[in-house]
A protein has these predicted regions:
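DNA-recognition alpha helix
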Residues: 1
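RNase H-like nuclease fold core
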Residues: 4-101, 106, 110, 114-118
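Extended amphipathic alpha-helical interaction segments
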Residues: 110, 114-177
Length: 177
């Protein structure tokens, strides 16, 4: 068995490292894109299983390397919660990103508009794909998935746009959601 002194010492060290990581400077990070997402995880608190919402920010450096910048438990994905996370990143020296990838949560989009108005925003293709399938009958999932993948992996922006129009035309006729 592990003694409570060992647990206390270990917790103090982990807490100290966690606090240092959460307050580290981001001024020298060559971050050009951000991926922002809220996720729900199941945890045990006071011997009871419960769900908590985590706000996660991943930075993408100029060389394509991904860096975890923030993971915060804020009680949900409200505009205020996301604004607090974004303000903290800016306070730590994060420069204005060139591009944002988001999950589509309304609170996040409002917080972004308040902090980085004008930065291009793209809906995460994984979230969009899940949303499409959630609104379609299961018998169409494979075909919709194949068409969607074909569209998002097109080689040029012109090809993407042509495939997007084709996707919309086909699926508006085949399945009105």
């Amino acid at each position: 068995a592990v003694g409570k002194d060992t647990v206390s010492r270990t917790w103090r060290k982990v807490k100290s490292d966690w606090d240092a990581w959460n307050t580290r400077s981001l001024a020298e990070e060559p971050i050009v894109r951000l991926i922002l997402d809220g996720t729900v995880v199941r945890v045990r608190l006071d011997r009871k299983a419960t769900s908590i919402s985590l706000l996660v920010v991943i930075g993408v450096r100029e060389d394509g390397q991904k860096v975890l910048l923030a993971i915060k438990s804020m009680g949900g994905e409200s505009t205020e919660a996301w604004r607090s996370v974004l303000d903290d990143l800016i306070k730590r020296g994060l420069r204005r990103p060139e591009f944002l990838i988001v999950d589509g949560a309304p609170g996040l989009e409002k917080a972004i508009a308040a902090v980085w108005d004008g930065v291009p925003v793209q809906r995460c293709t994984v979230h969009k794909h899940r949303n499409l399938l959630a609104h379609a009958p299961e018998r169409l999932h494979e075909e919709i998935g194949a068409d969607y993948t074909d569209m998002i992996y097109a080689a040029t922006s012109e090809e993407i746009e042509a495939r997007r129009k084709s996707f919309i035309r086909k699926w508006r006729l085949k399945h009105r959601a």
